[in-house]
Structures are given as structure tokens and as C-alpha cells.
Regions:
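Surface-exposed cleft-lining segments at the edges of enzyme active sites
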Residues: 55, 136-149, 175-184
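C-terminal active-site subregion of NodB/CE4 polysaccharide deacetylases
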Residues: 2-102, 109, 180-303
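Acidic (Asp/Glu)-rich catalytic clusters
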Residues: 35-40, 74-76, 116-123, 153-169, ...
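Histidine/lysine/aspartate-rich catalytic loop segments that bind and position anionic ligands
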Residues: 153-158, 162-187, 193, 201
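Generic enzyme active-site microenvironment
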Residues: 102-103, 169
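Short loop/turn segments at strand-loop or loop-helix junctions that form parts
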Residues: 46-51, 130-131, 170-173
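A short, conserved beta-to-alpha structural element at the edge of catalytic cores
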Residues: 122-144
Length: 303
């Protein structure tokens, strides 16, 4: 399969990340202490796609590396559900290094190892699902494009994941680029249609949505307005950014955890180059959250 070259390149990136982290460890330690002492520690939300050893892709992490990630995260962070991460970042003060774990798409192999491993450790995660591949059994379009037709989850597996205590989230019906859709009806069909399918499977209520691809250009004001109107508790992007205490917390920024251990450690040990989000967004951040959504968020964290 034509994906070996990116993994060789990723090996060099891991080495470079380790070297840079080593060179800046003193600066990072001082910054960590200052943020903890000042109760200003940002919250990280990680996203994975597929945990498997066979057929590696740029959005796959090996079982061994996933275990290493979890070991290190458990030693250094509170690992909390997405709703609790949202609650903490809405508080003006946070002194506890905090991580939430999410998955995108819905790959069958996650039921072989990742989900059981999280369950064994009693760790929470939110599992965002693109529904049409689950219904049809067809591989995701980005896998077909890379000549690597990996199996999606089945409806029964999604139900099993939910029954195991993991939260299910929306990820559109067809894993489309929402930023390319200009008609409200098309955006509704992809976002709300996917959520309705998930809830019809008995895995709701669906509280969170993640944008496929997740870069700023893959989002839109139309979609954000629709999510607010539909009463969802928040949405996730995936372009690599922290979430700072005292924010509204409807937009949840995520960090890509698939690439490897050293890039993950470099991010989460406070790389000073990445502390602030300088991305131009095609939507206005909500300035306040409707009270009914805040009440729903309180109920989620109380469960």
C-alpha cells in the first residue's frame, strides 16, 4: 500500500520533536510551574482515528504506541470526559493538567484493542462516528483514495461502544467537508441527519459534533449556527490548539495524537510556539451559551 514513505518522514519528525523538547526542557518546566501556580493551565483535547498494527496509515497509531500514550497521559494528566473538560475550561481558573480523549470516523479495529484497553483502565473517551460508512460497510473515502480500504465499525459495534460507557458523537453522514457546503439543507442533512441516525441506533443523546478534516476551512458559520440552534453542547475542530480557562467552551480545539509519542509529548509539555491559537476562523466564536445548553452540560458532568 502506498503509505510507507509518509511513515519514514514521520520517523524524522519524531526525532526532531524529541530533540527540540530536550533543548527547551528548562523553559517548559518554568512555564508549567507558572501556569499551575497561576491556575491558568490550558486543557488539551486529543483526537485519534485508528489503533492497529496492520496496514499503517498517517491516521493510524500502533497498539504499542497507544499503550505508551496512555501510560504517559495517566502519569501526567487528569484524563476526563469531554463534558468535564468543557466544564473546566469554562471556569476562569484551572491548575490541573487535563486531557480528554476523542476518536474520529469509526474504525472497526478500534474494537479489537483501543476500546478494550481504555475500558480496562477505566478511561473515558468520546467516539465521533460518520454514519453512512457504518451503515453501508464501505470504507471511508479518504481510505479508498489512498488505496487502503479499511473496515468501518458496524452498527452493533457502535452500540457496544456506547454500552461500554463511551460517549458517541456526530461526525456527519458521509465524512464530507462541511466548509464546501453552502446550502443550509445540505449542511442540515449531513450534520443533523448523521445525529438522527446515531440516536436511532440507541446511542444518544448526541451532545457533541466534530468537523471532518477539522481545519478552519472545513468549518463554516452556517454549520456553527446550526449546531447552536440544534442544542448541541459543543463542537470540535482538529487543527492543533489548546483550550484556555475562562473561555466560552463551545468550540473545543483538538490536538492530533496519531503521529507519534514524541510529537505528543512536545505538544503537551507546553511548546511555547503553540500556546496561542493564531488561526483565522470562518465563524464567530459564540460569546455566550444559551442557558439550556449550560444546564445540559451540568447534567452530563454529574453523570
Amino acid at each position: 500500500m502506498p503509505i510507507a514513505a509518509p511513515h519514514i518522514a514521520n520517523g524524522y519528525r519524531q526525532w526532531a520533536a524529541w530533540l527540540y523538547r530536550l533543548a527547551t526542557r528548562g523553559q517548559r518546566a518554568k512555564l508549567r510551574r507558572r501556569l499551575i501556580d497561576g491556575s491558568e493551565f490550558p486543557i488539551a483535547i486529543l483526537f485519534y482515528h485508528r489503533v492497529a498494527d496492520a496496514h499503517p496509515t498517517p491516521w493510524t497509531i500502533s497498539r504499542r504506541n497507544f499503550v505508551r500514550h496512555l501510560d504517559w497521559l495517566e502519569q501526567n494528566f487528569d484524563i476526563v470526559p469531554l463534558a468535564e473538560a468543557q466544564r473546566r475550561l469554562r471556569n476562569p481558573r484551572n491548575a490541573r493538567p487535563t486531557v480528554a480523549i476523542t476518536f474520529d470516523d469509526g474504525y472497526a479495529e478500534n474494537c479489537d484493542f483501543a476500546i478494550p484497553e481504555l475500558q480496562r483502565r477505566n478511561l473515558p473517551a468520546t467516539y465521533f462516528v460518520a454514519t453512512e460508512s457504518v451503515i453501508s460497510g464501505r470504507p471511508f473515502g479518504h481510505d479508498e483514495k489512498n488505496n487502503c480500504p479499511l473496515p468501518p465499525n458496524t452498527i452493533a459495534e457502535i452500540r457496544d461502544i456506547a454500552r461500554a460507557g463511551f460517549e458517541i458523537g456526530g461526525h456527519t453522514k458521509n465524512h464530507v467537508d462541511i466548509g464546501q457546503l453552502t446550502q443550509r439543507a445540505a449542511v442540515e442533512e449531513e450534520i443533523l441527519g448523521g445525529i438522527k441516525e446515531l440516536e436511532a441506533w440507541g446511542v444518544g443523546p448526541i451532545q457533541f459534533f466534530s468537523f471532518p478534516f477539522g481545519l478552519p476551512q472545513n468549518t463554516s458559520q452556517l454549520a456553527v449556527d446550526l449546531l447552536l440552534e440544534a442544542g448541541l453542547s459543543g463542537f470540535c475542530t482538529a487543527y492543533g490548539a489548546w483550550n484556555w480557562p475562562g473561555s466560552v467552551g463551545y468550540h473545543l480545539r483538538r490536538i492530533h495524537a496519531d503521529p507519534g509519542m514524541q510529537t505528543l509529548k512536545s505538544w503537551l509539555t507546553l511548546d511555547a510556539r503553540k500556546l496561542r491559537d493564531s488561526h483565522a476562523l470562518p465563524f464567530c466564536e459564540p460569546e455566550r451559551i444559551p442557558q439550556k445548553l449550560l444546564d445540559a452540560s451540568v447534567q452530563l458532568t454529574a453523570v
